[in-house]
Amino acid sequence: MTPFRRKQLVGIAGALPACVLAALTLDHAGDLFGFVALPADDPSSRLAFALRWMLLPGFCLLLGVVVAGRRGFVADAIDGTREPASHGLEITLRYNQNTLEQTLLAGIAWANLAINLPIAHLVLIPAMATLFAIGRGAFWVGYLIYPTGRAFGMVLAALPTIASYAWVAWRAYCGWAE
């Protein structure tokens, strides 16, 4: 087996449990997140609900920025180069870039879900926010351990967003009636 094939298999081995966990969490979101107070059934309340849950991705990004900022004052990173000598700082910068991208994509998806989901299904947004936060943490820790170790966290954070885009696109462009 080639080293490349081995890395692919390790990535798949990390991604599969994330797929199962995401599917189970979203399937049982009503039970797991039944304690969450749903908003009034009007567009502004729905969007405010989604925005409040965007704090979890925001905190993930803020944590990465704070860690990178603190690491920027150590001797091997004080010059501010894009490729610092510190492996940990380089991974943190990559985490921040990817978290920024994922946060933007999630925000667009969740705003669309907030407007289009039936009110009882809005509980999916807190479920996705929780998966996002756990996934970003697992991505960061896994990446620090070994690059292919980031697969579980990447899939756990990204899969609900991808599914959201698919559902919203289907609804918007295929004329799925209410």
For the regions a protein language model found, what residue spans apply to each?
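Core segments of transmembrane alpha-helices
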Residues: P57-G58, Q97-W110
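Interfacial loop-to-transmembrane junctions
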Residues: R6-K7, A138-A163
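Short membrane-interface loop/juxtamembrane segments of multi-pass integral membrane proteins
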Residues: G80-T103
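Juxtamembrane boundary at the C-terminal end of a transmembrane helix
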Residues: A166-E178
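Long, highly hydrophobic alpha-helical transmembrane signal-anchor segments
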Residues: M1-F59
